[in-house]
Amino acid sequence: MKNDDSSTVLSTEHKAMQEDLARATRAGGETEKAAWQVTRVLFPHVYREEEFAMPPLLLLPRLARGEVTPDMESILTKTEIMKAELPRMLAEHKAIVTALRKLLQAATAEGHAGFASFAQKLIQHAQMEEEILYPASILVGEYLKLKLGKT
């Protein structure tokens, strides 16, 4: 199974997020401090997302077309890791959202509307991951196990 996740929408979104956050770490004041805290909790989490949450999602278009091939079995390792790591990923989201709320508050107080908007969008992004992407990633594995006759 060949997937190049370097050009996925989610990877592109993560790169843009990192660039915006890097700008916020140079904003000065409480906004800068809050942005650094977001950075500390966010980047290890994003790495794990891109390592085992996102690759299964790349199969969704093929699976939606009814394509299931034996080489897709290789993704099951990642979906099992995702299933095991889900509680940790959700706990990390709580820490990330807490840090983002501090960034939102600081940026608003200091007149950095762009960074405040960025923080709000990231909070919504985390919610979307929890409600849609993480479950979908796990479901890819469960679906493949059924279709490939794996238990």
Locate each region found by the language model:
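Small-residue-biased structural context
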Residues: 1-151
